[in-house]
Amino acid sequence: MAQDVLAVVMARGGSVGLPGKAVRMLLGKPVIGYTFGHVRESRLITGTVVSSDDAEVLRLGREAGLEVIERPAELATATSATDPVLRHAVRALYGEGAARPAAVVMLYGNVPVRRNGMIDRCIEMLFATGCDSVQTVASVGKMHPYWMFDRKEDGRIRKHVANDVFRRQDLPALFSPTGAVYVMRTEVLLGGEG
C-alpha cells in the first residue's frame, strides 16, 4: 500500500467545557503531544498537519516538527463541523491541480489514548474494504437506548424505546464513536461540499 495519507491533528483553542484541554499537561507532557506521538508511530501516514486557531497548539506542533495551519475563525467555533476544517487543511497544503493524498486521517488533539497500531489498522481497513470511511467505535454496553428513559411533564418516567428486553445478553449490538480515529478517502471528503 504505497498511497499518500495525510493526518490532520485538530485542536480548537476555545473549548467551553475544559479551556485549553489540548495543551494541558498530562503525565509530564501536553495532551496533544500524545497524538503527535501516535502520528509518529504510524507506518502509513505520509504527512501530518496541525490545524488550530490557538497559538500554543500551533507552537507545540512546530516544536514537534509538524506543519501547522492557522485555522480561520469561522472554522474554529464551538459549532464548526469537522469536514470543512479537513477540506481547508487539504486545500491549504495541496493547491489546485496538485496531487492529493488518497486518504485523510482526522485526529482530535484532545484524545491522548489510542491503542497501539489503531491508526494503521483503520487506514488498512479503508483501503482493503473499498469503503469511503472508517472510524473507531465502542459498544454502548449497558448505556443502551433500550434501557434509557424519558421523563414526562408530570415527572414520571417511561422507556425511551418501547421493548421487552431485560437481560444484557438480549440487547441488540449498538456502537458509539470514540473519537480516536477517523479515516476517509480524500475524494469523498472533497466531494462532500455543503
Where are these regions (language model features)?
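N-terminal glycine-rich phosphate-binding loop and ensuing alpha1 helix
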Residues: 4-51
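Histidine-centered beta-alpha loop that forms part of the nucleotide-sugar donor binding/catalytic region
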Residues: 12, 73, 138-139
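Residues that recognize and position ribonucleotide moieties
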Residues: 16, 105, 182
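Short, high-confidence coil segments that cap the C-terminus of an alpha-helix
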Residues: 45, 99-101, 128-132
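Short, polar loop motifs at secondary-structure junctions
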Residues: 52-57, 186-188
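Short phosphate-binding loop-to-helix
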Residues: 55-105, 114, 121
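Conserved core of the sugar-phosphate nucleotidyltransferase
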Residues: 84, 88, 112-194
